[in-house]
Amino acid sequence: MKTKLNELLEFPCSFTYKVMGIAEPQLVDQVVEVVQRHAPGEYTPQVKPSSKGNYHSVSITITATHIDQVETLYEELGNLELVKMVL
């Protein structure tokens, strides 16, 4: 039996997204823009380059208020052109 994400979380809660994408200057701005639409606030994402510098990992933490918000952000962040993966 699979445990669903909403069964593991108690809202509101802190929720961190790790977004992996192509190392372009606009990647961080695009991630923050999407997050701001669904969870307005002040964000200071952490950015780590890959060993070869081709990709960046952007970590951003929100205060999630419901499971729909979490799932919508996964979908919209994953739809960004520069993004390769969202964890």
Curated annotation (Swiss-Prot):
Pfam families assigned to the protein according to its UniProt record, in alphabetical order: DUF493
GO cellular component terms attached to this protein's record: cytosol
Protein family according to the UniProt entry: Belongs to the UPF0250 family.
NCBIfam families recorded: PRK04998.1 (NF003447)
Entry-linked InterPro entries: UPF0250_YbeD-like (IPR007454), YbeD-like_sf (IPR027471)
Protein name in UniProt: UPF0250 protein YPO2600/y1174/YP_1113
